[in-house]
Amino acid sequence: MDIRQVTETIAMIEEQNFDIRTITMGISLLDCIDTDIDWAAEKIYKKITTKAKDLVAVGDEIAAELGIPIVNKRVSVTPISLIGAATDSRDYVPLAKALDKAAKEIGVDFIGGFSALVQKGYQKGDEILINSIPRALAETDKVCSSVNIGSTKTGINMTAVADMGRIIKETAQLSDMGAAKLVVFANAVEDNPFMAGAFHGVGEADVVINVGVSGPGVVKRALEKVRGESFDVVAETVKKTAFKITRIGQLVGQMASECLGVKFGIVDLSLAPTPAVGDSVARVLEEMGLETVGTHGTTAALALLNDQVKKGGVMACNQVGGLSGAFIPVSEDEGMIAAVQNGSLNLEKLEAMTAICSVGLDMIAIPEATPAETIAAMIADEAAIGVINQKTTAVRIIPKGKEGDMIEFGELLGTAPVMKVNQASSAAFIARGGQIPAPIHSFKN
């Protein structure tokens, strides 16, 4: 590495808000299954506190050694609906509390996996877990929850979609932060290091390390140097910058896996913003020539950014996965917040952007009075985009306050302006239930 590359890396960290967003340890809990829920909870606590006991210390040591901030250390576990199904319990809150207790003991920021996979229907444990979500998130501090309600191979479980509209409302009513820790997915991935949607897939190794990087500020600074150049130059600039960011992520992941003695999983190529000025995906899009995010051209700019991040990242690291693309959470991106406040960005434009980027309608506050059926219809729309386009989409929305209010989540989750929602009813549509079939192009065997 020549001196120019060294100084570039230092500038990325000191001036451009580059950091490793998360080191996430995925842990299988399949060997914790027990017919007695209290025994299952005890086994879960013991396994997590044994396997992840050094995760935070190792993360801090690597950060100090490399001089690169590692913002979060997290754990993801096997979907708890699979563990709870062996018990006779009608309530999985004790398992959520075991996760929370373990997370606090080892000092991680969040623990994900209070989850269910219901894309084609409910099993016993799925229904119990989903109905346990509001209390589980209200009575814990670090637990995150997710539900997969659709996939390209199976279509969309509209009964589950309707249920999740109700569950999101109940969760928001029971606790201020609960809905911010609940994600509804289509095409959920098994190796996602980012919260709140992380869970450890059953096809994964017993314990793995997955890494998520963050570098919107680095990309913006690189684009500032090519103002007025053609899109060919813009694309090449983003690709080269993504390569550097991902290379560092791979180094951190490999070091962590060696120190902890566990398998290295993937680097998630996602560009994840924070509420800090200079760490915004929206400002990257504006640097391409948009007056403000939300205006015409926004979706095209996001498409270029997303694709070139993937191309640069894949060149830098063999093991890539997770969500891998640009995140557009409203509350966690100061540029997105500004665009909502000035009226240039609305829910409909955000939905169009989700056809391009990672995840979907993320960290968006909507009026508290929004009906559960309308929330369910938003989930259905996002799921349709994911299922038809063979990509991950999701909804993480928070029904709080009234239109125009500002909802404060604090720290990494930021602040969200309450956005306008279409007032026309979707109730009769959602009441149908059943399954929207898989698209024709899913039939590939």
Swiss-Prot record:
Q: Which SUPFAM superfamilies match?
A: PFL-like glycyl radical enzymes
Q: Which domain of life is it from?
A: Bacteria
Q: Which Pfam families match?
A: DUF711
Q: How does it assemble?
A: Homodimer.
Q: Which NCBIfam families match?
A: PRK05313.1
Q: Which family does it belong to?
A: Belongs to the UPF0210 family.
Annotated protein name in UniProt: UPF0210 protein SSA_2018
What is the species of this protein? Streptococcus sanguinis (strain SK36)
Upper lineage is: Bacteria, Bacillati, Bacillota, Bacilli, Lactobacillales
